[in-house]
UniProtKB/Swiss-Prot annotation:
Matching Gene3D superfamilies: Ribonuclease III domain (1.10.1520.10)
PANTHER family linked to this entry: MINI-RIBONUCLEASE 3
Compartments reported by the entry: Cytoplasm
SUPFAM superfamilies for the chain: RNase III domain-like
Annotated protein name in UniProt: Mini-ribonuclease 3
Entry keywords, A to Z: Cytoplasm, Endonuclease, Hydrolase, Magnesium, Nuclease, Ribosome biogenesis, RNA-binding, rRNA processing, rRNA-binding
SMART domains documented for this protein: RIBOc (SM00535)
One Pfam entry name: Ribonuclease_3
HAMAP family assigned: RNase_Mini_III
Function: Involved in correct processing of both the 5' and 3' ends of 23S rRNA precursor. Processes 30S rRNA precursor transcript even in absence of ribonuclease 3 (Rnc); Rnc processes 30S rRNA into smaller rRNA precursors.
The protein's assembly and partners: Homodimer.
Record gene name: mrnC
Family label: Belongs to the MrnC RNase family.
List of catalytic residues: 33
């Protein structure tokens, strides 16, 4: 996913890591969830398919179970600071949907929190990590 240095949605400024850490983990996860779904939609758009097929592929790829798997694959690449952001996100995970185990939901929330945090304060690192994640039709 192309993450521009200057983003009209974020403004022309990045937050400092200290400022981004002041945001609630749930807020960062909310942002990270939207970013990851957008990333998957961009990656699955081509080759051209019917919109229903693209939608089904995206839904499968952004499920919490899949995000939990992706987080596990990223863990060796994360810095101590990033691992702390993931931990904060996991610990802040709210009510778990019935179809999920708490562990999957917490891990998915941890990944989303990290993505939201990096979007706000380190877009190059966000892009580097997103490139490490395989986007497959699930």
């Amino acid at each position: 996913m192309f993450v521009p240095e200057s983003d009209p949605l974020r403004g022309d400024r990045r937050l400092s890591p200290a400022a981004a850490k002041q945001l609630a983990p749930q807020a960062l996860a909310y942002l990270g969830d939207a970013l990851y779904e957008f990333h998957v939609r961009l990656r699955l758009l081509l080759p051209a398919q019917r919109s229903h097929q693209v939608h089904q592929s995206v839904v499968g790829a952004v499920r919490a179970e899949r995000q939990a798997e992706l987080l596990v694959s990223l863990l060796p690449l994360l810095t101590a600071e990033e691992l702390e952001i993931v931990r904060r996100g996991r610990n802040a995970a709210g009510r778990v949907p019935r179809r999920l185990t708490g562990e999957y939901y917490q891990q998915a929330t941890g990944l989303e929190t990290l993505l939201g945090y990096l979007y706000l304060c380190d877009p190059q690192r966000l892009q580097a990590l997103l490139q490490q994640l395989p986007v497959t039709e699930y």
